[in-house]
């Protein structure tokens, strides 16, 4: 029998070789939008005070407070993502020469930090003219549908370079980021490989940093 129904290709996380194989074998594919941004970290007690409207925080019985943020800036969504109350920032790279971070909370949400992704919606047309971060790969030059993938890879590599070619994460105080200033010191962090001060506003694309700053 001939199967004529749909086929779902469940590639999982960071299966970039699969998409390159599909493009090389002339399987029709198209780019989709992604979300790119930073991870914010705060003292858990500060978020408790704000969310519970109590300068004494959450007390003995309330859980570590969460928050959610959603807005539109210049026609693109800007929103919090994967908020981790009483949690940690952890390395999440899936390949060499990458720095990627994620967040997690233990079951007791007992860390003295809380963190959240803060991301900007990115559409393929946003990056087509970004020569700084779109890799000039002649082998893939005939596959514009891979442009978003290359953009993501190069941004992860830039993070690795800015981190000193280690898993140290480039970081900036939030107030300095919005004012476009280098942070001369950084607060203590839950991210165990450590942080290094870096002007994120300078080397990340303006269509990301500008919307995040607003």
Q: Would you name each region that the model predicts?
A:
Residues 1-214:
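Residues forming the flavin
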């Amino acid at each position: 029998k001939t199967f004529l129904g749909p086929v779902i290709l469940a590639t999982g996380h960071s299966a970039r070789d699969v998409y390159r194989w599909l493009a090389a074998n002339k399987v029709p594919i198209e780019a989709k939008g992604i979300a790119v941004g930073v991870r914010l970290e705060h003292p858990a007690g500060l978020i408790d005070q704000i969310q519970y409207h109590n300068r004494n925080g959450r007390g003995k019985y309330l859980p570590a407070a969460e928050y959610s943020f959603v807005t539109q800036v210049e026609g693109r969504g800007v929103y919090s993502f994967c908020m981790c109350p009483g949690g940690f920032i952890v390395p999440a790279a899936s390949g060499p020469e990458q720095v990627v971070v994620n967040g997690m909370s233990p079951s007791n949400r007992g860390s003295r930090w809380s963190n959240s992704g803060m991301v900007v919606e990115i559409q393929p047309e946003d990056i087509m003219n970004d020569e700084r971060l779109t890799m000039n790969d002649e082998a893939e030059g005939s596959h514009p549908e891979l442009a978003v993938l290359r953009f993501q890879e190069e941004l992860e590599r830039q993070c690795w370079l800015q981190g000193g070619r280690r898993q140290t994460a480039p970081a900036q105080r939030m107030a300095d980021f919005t004012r476009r200033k280098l942070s001369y010191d950084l607060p203590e962090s839950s991210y165990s490989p450590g942080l290094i001060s870096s002007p994120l506003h300078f080397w990340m694309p303006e269509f990301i940093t500008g919307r995040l700053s607003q």
